[in-house]
């Protein structure tokens, strides 16, 4: 999956991608599941990770809404 496909999955809150990747938001320091009900962040503030552990190791914390 490329960046645009992952971002589109976030925009549509597509739960079928749960566990395939995690989205981290640089402006908030939080990482989420693709189906998170939180507002979709701006493209320039998003990084994608294959595991939650990778997002945590880069300093992001788990979202309190979707509990990844």
Predicted regions span which residues?
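Mature, structured domains enriched in cysteine- and short glycine motifs
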Residues: 1-68
